[in-house]
């Protein structure tokens, strides 16, 4: 794996359940991994006992003072502080590129086979190659970040999947040369790709690969308590506040419905017209 790259696993309150670490190694990743733990985590010492120098700590209050929570709640329960700390942490460990991952991934998969046919193939030895290719894409294009797809991106199977989507959620390949800030205590990934995408910044999801994540609220720790306290109703309205011209509230689900945001992409981001539509010049 390239030496200027590292993986940051953002984790809180569950040192015995960092599934992502084990899955990365099982998938063939040979590079550096760091667990990003905040200074308010009561289980921080247990992380250090298990992972030693692979644990990086940051001050939540310092990060909060430099960003927009999107609310006035009197607490700091959110992953957003860890997300925004990663650029400083990357410089600290001498990395130019990094990927932010949550701590509860059970698998990484390729969604197309070698003949470019729609498939589902578990990654067992080529994780270095996947992450290196995402870094090269970041290097050679003007994107702010690139994400690995999630299961919901493939609803509709081969009829619904496409090779690129103009959003980024959950995993983020970033560079210290192109820093940006996540905004909003909840729904921070959506708030960020919509509010910055609105200004022409590029966020992409690569559909060639997918990560599998535990269902929200299934495991204690992380953001579970925040979601249980406020629910998806409050969560979705953060994005309405940041981008009211292109966000509305709806419901999703089959039998058990829940409130969720809906993005109108026609209003959300600038689009590039084909050159054939350009007006002639005198």
Where are the language model's segments positioned?
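Short hydrophobic segments within beta-strands
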Residues: 8-10, 36, 101, 206
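A structural signal for short, well-ordered beta-strand segments and their strand-loop junctions
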Residues: 97-102, 144-149, 203-207, 248-251
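Hydrophobic targeting segments
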Residues: 3-9, 24, 31-35
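C-terminal catalytic/acceptor-binding lobe
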Residues: 2-5, 15-16, 184, 190-282
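Active-site-proximal specificity loops/subdomain of glycosyltransferases
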Residues: 38-99, 106-119
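Short, well-formed alpha-helical segments that are part of the catalytic scaffolds
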Residues: 9-28, 40-48
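Conserved catalytic core of nucleotide-sugar-dependent glycosyltransferases
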Residues: 106-195
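A short acidic (Asp/Glu
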Residues: 18-21, 44-48, 109-112, 156-162, ...
């Amino acid at each position: 794996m390239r030496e200027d790259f590292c993986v940051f696993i953002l984790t809180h309150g569950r040192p015995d359940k960092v599934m992502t670490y084990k899955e990365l190694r099982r998938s063939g990743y040979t590079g550096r991994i760091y667990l990003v733990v905040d200074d308010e985590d009561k289980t921080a010492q247990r992380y250090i006992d298990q992972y030693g120098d692979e644990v990086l700590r940051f001050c939540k209050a310092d990060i909060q003072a430099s960003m927009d929570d999107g609310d006035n709640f009197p607490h700091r329960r959110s992953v957003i502080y860890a997300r925004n700390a990663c650029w400083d942490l990357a410089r600290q460990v001498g990395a130019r590129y990094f990927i932010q991952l949550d701590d509860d991934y059970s698998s990484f998969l390729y969604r197309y086979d070698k003949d470019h046919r729609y498939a589902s193939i578990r990654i067992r030895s080529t994780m270095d190659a996947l992450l290196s290719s995402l870094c090269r894409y970041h290097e050679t294009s003007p994107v702010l970040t690139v994400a690995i797809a999630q299961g919901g991106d493939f609803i509709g199977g081969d009829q619904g999947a496409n090779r690129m989507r103009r959003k980024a959620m959950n995993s983020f390949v970033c560079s210290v040369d192109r820093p940006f800030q996540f905004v909003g205590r909840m729904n921070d990934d959506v708030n960020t790709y919509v509010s910055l995408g609105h200004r022409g910044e590029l966020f992409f999801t690569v559909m060639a690969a997918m990560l599998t994540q535990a269902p929200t609220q299934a495991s204690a720790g992380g953001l579970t308590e925040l979601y249980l306290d406020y629910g998806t109703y409050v969560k979705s309205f953060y994005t309405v506040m940041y981008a009211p011209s292109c966000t509305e509230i709806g419901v999703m689900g089959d039998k058990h419905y829940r409130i969720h945001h809906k993005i109108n992409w026609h209003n959300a981001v600038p689009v590039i017209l084909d050159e054939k539509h350009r007006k002639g010049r005198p």
